[in-house]
Curated annotation (Swiss-Prot):
Annotated GO MF terms: rRNA binding; structural constituent of ribosome
Task performed by this protein: One of the primary rRNA binding proteins, this protein initially binds near the 5'-end of the 23S rRNA. It is important during the early stages of 50S assembly. It makes multiple contacts with different domains of the 23S rRNA in the assembled 50S subunit and ribosome. Forms part of the polypeptide exit tunnel.
Lineage of source species: Bacteria, Bacillati, Bacillota, Bacilli, Bacillales
Record gene name: rplD
Record flagged with keyword Lipid metabolism: no
Compositional bias ranges of the Basic residues kind: 60-71
Taxonomic source organism: Listeria monocytogenes serovar 1/2a (strain ATCC BAA-679 / EGD-e)
Region (Disordered): 47-78
Protein name: Large ribosomal subunit protein uL4
Disulfide partners: none
Amino acid sequence: MPKLSLLKQDGTNAGEITLNDTVFGIEPNEKVVVDVILSQRASLRQGTHKVKNRSEVRGGGRKPWRQKGTGRARQGSIRSPQWRGGGVVFGPTPRSYAYKLPKKVRRLAIKSILSSKVNEEKLVVLEGLTFDAPKTKEFAAFLKNISVDTKALIVVAGESENVELSARNLQGITVIPAESISVLEVAKHDKLIITKAAVEKVEEVLA
């Protein structure tokens, strides 16, 4: 089972924590991780693109010239697709790009990316993380204490308003509750900082 140092908020050592092998110690499956990231990114697409077909373009109700006798090609409407300003054939319409992957695949992906962070020594476990008031300066000092100077995802147990507000103005820092942890969020950040209570919640769901 993976063992990591447990850090206090001031960066000092608070002992060791043993992580669940089935969540943080599996052989990472990169293919599954990529599949889930693509699925989650597809779900974020708005899909609001829209063009007008010939029935939606304004005008074109009258036949532009008579059928025969003019020497010109027959036309039924000035809004048919070959005309300038005409309707579009087979153009994009509003749609959802979301698609679901099996639950087993999604669970394997989150376990894989968590295990990758452990293997790459990019997972930091905290004894706890609390702030009496929203203070960006204090949060920046905390990051310095634990030697984090890159993009970091901070996972806490449940909602923590003071922590979220303290981190809001720091570029590259995201705070989420343990229930919202996702493959895409973990992949977007270089380091994963997670509290001991959040580890227990994640293990409870995934183990």
